Amino acid sequence: MYTILLIGIGGFIGAVLRYSLSGWVQNSFVNFPLGTLVVNIVGSFFLGLVMYLSEYQGLFSEETRILLTIGLLGAFTTLSTFSYESFRLLESSKLMQLTMNIVATVLFSIFAVYLGKISALNLAAYLRGIK
């Protein structure tokens, strides 16, 4: 029950953050789903960061990792919105924007996880040097 509560709290925070950031970014870009793209890239970075700090550096407890990854980041990032927005671009025959959206989301999200990993390793090395 405690784990479900942690996921729910994290999910609430992640959903509110996603709504806020995505809406703020999207206000400037009407014809391209930049808000969702930014949210997915930022979320991928933080997922990489948290997972590497947690799994390989032992920096977070299992409860904190669950709250941050399954709860907060699970609600923050969204494949369903990406899929819907991509389909709408296809439906509108905006094939160039569709291609850009798919390629940018996949490549930048994977790269963001990599940057999260590198950041986690650097942070862990820095923290070990402080001790």
UniProtKB/Swiss-Prot annotation:
Write out the similarity annotation. Answer: Belongs to the fluoride channel Fluc/FEX (TC 1.A.43) family.
What is a single cellular component term in the Gene Ontology annotation?
A: plasma membrane
Which keywords does this chain's UniProt record carry? Cell membrane, Ion channel, Ion transport, Membrane, Metal-binding, Sodium, Transmembrane, Transmembrane helix, Transport
Its protein name is: Fluoride-specific ion channel FluC 1
* Membrane-spanning ranges: 4-24, 32-52, 66-86, 95-115
Which Pfam families does the record match to this protein? CRCB (PF02537)
Which membrane topology term applies here? Multi-pass membrane protein
Asked if the Swiss-Prot or TrEMBL record annotates the protein with the keyword Zinc-finger, the reply is no
Q: Where in the cell is it found?
A: Cell membrane
Quote the function comment for this protein: Fluoride-specific ion channel. Important for reducing fluoride concentration in the cell, thus reducing its toxicity.
Kindly list the positions annotated as binding Na(+).
Answer: 74, 77
InterPro entries found in the cross-reference section: FluC
Would the keyword Ion transport turn up in this protein's UniProt record?
yes
The gene for this chain is fluC1
From the UniProt record, list the reaction(s) this protein catalyses.
fluoride(in) = fluoride(out)
- Which GO biological process categories is it annotated with? cellular detoxification of fluoride; fluoride transmembrane transport
Q: Which GO terms describe its molecular function?
A: fluoride channel activity; fluoride transmembrane transporter activity; metal ion binding
- The highest taxon in the source lineage is Archaea
Activation/inhibition comment? Na(+) is not transported, but it plays an essential structural role and its presence is essential for fluoride channel function.
